[in-house]
Design a protein with these regions (language model features):
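A membrane-interface helix-boundary motif in multi-pass transporters
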Residues: 1-5, 226-241
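Multi-pass alpha-helical transporter architecture, strongest
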Residues: 14-20, 24, 240-268
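Intracellular cytosolic loops and amphipathic helices of Major Facilitator Superfamily
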Residues: 18-79, 261-274
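Extracytoplasmic gate region of multi-pass secondary transporters
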Residues: 72-131
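Interfacial helix-cap and linker-helix signal at transmembrane-aqueous boundaries
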Residues: 105-106, 136-137, 222-230
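Structural signature of the two symmetry-related core transmembrane helices
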Residues: 144-158
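Helix-loop junctions at membrane interfaces in 12-TM secondary transporters
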Residues: 162-171
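Intracellular juxtamembrane helix-capping segments at the cytosolic ends
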Residues: 182-195
């Protein structure tokens, strides 16, 4: 079974051949010939000679020199902290459930086999949630979709402690998977949307790294609650609380400072000037 872990290694040559580098990275490496090919495809009307030197925006180049500091510049500081909080709570829910869902369902009176089936349904729900969240984010504001997912996750987790019907429990667990693990996958997309390309990798990387605090705390905290022999409902409500905190954190993010909002604003101004 563990040999499955070799599969990503097999994909490395394919990824290296097919995944394109970003324009910013190619500029940094001085790959002028490749950049000119891309520029001619994007703007066939522009005259780009062989001796033309393509350069980056000076402000962007400056930001590349201090990527970590740039996370807190131009009004992004508070929102960066809120993104970290959202990641922490999202990963808290994911790792709490991955670590303790089987045990919690066994505490509810289910056999080990049935409890493991709940884990399978949980992960199937996460696939559905990620796809649905991505589709909804293309139709509506990704921030609003993320807030709704956090709230739905909190509500579903609370209901999980009070649902007694086995059939209904599978439905609720499916929704929990869609709105917790699915939410966390959506959070990565939102962080990427918030930061400009020059610091996008740094922004998403720091959010993911700081968010791991929630992943570390979750199994320990829920384990402590389980050892206290609290009612099952209170264990699920403790996990649900993280969802509510995550929803508040995302709500507090200043969307006007996101890269997508800034780009739209500049495009609107340019259109009005023309």
């Amino acid at each position: 079974m563990f040999y499955v872990a070799v599969l990503p290694v097999v994909l490395i040559p394919f990824i290296l051949k097919t995944m394109p580098d970003s324009i910013g990275f190619m500029l940094k490496q001085g790959r002028q010939d490749e950049l000119k090919v891309i520029a001619r495809r994007l703007r066939p009307d522009l005259v780009i000679k062989d001796d033309t030197q393509l350069v980056g925006n000076p402000q962007i180049i400056s930001a590349q020199d201090k990527p970590v500091r740039s996370l807190f510049l131009e009004g992004r500081g508070y929102s960066t902290v809120m993104i970290w909080m959202a990641f922490m709570t999202g990963l808290f829910m994911v790792y709490a459930l991955n670590s303790w869902l089987t045990k919690l369902m066994a505490m509810a009176g289910f056999s080990l086999g049935s409890a493991l089936n709940f884990v399978i349904v949980f992960n199937l729900g996460s696939i559905f949630g990620a796809i649905l969240g991505g589709w909804l984010s293309d139709k509506f504001s990704i921030k609003h979709v993320l807030v709704v997912f956090y709230v739905v996750g909190a509500v579903a987790l609370t209901l999980l402690g009070y649902t007694r019907s086995t059939e209904l429990l599978f439905v609720v667990v499916f929704i929990v998977g869609a709105s917790t693990l699915g939410t966390q996958l959506l959070a990565y997309a939102y962080a990427g949307d918030f930061y400009p390309s020059t610091i996008r990798s740094t922004g998403v990387g720091f959010a993911s790294g700081v968010g791991r605090v929630g992943a570390i705390v979750a199994p320990v905290l829920i384990g402590a609650l389980v050892s206290m022999a609290l009612p099952l409902e209170q264990n699920f409500m403790a996990i649900a609380l993280a969802g509510l905190i995550g929803a508040v954190a995302v709500t507090m993010i200043n969307q006007s400072r996101s890269d997508s909002a800034v780009v739209r604003k500049k495009a609107t101004v340019a259109h009005e000037l023309t």
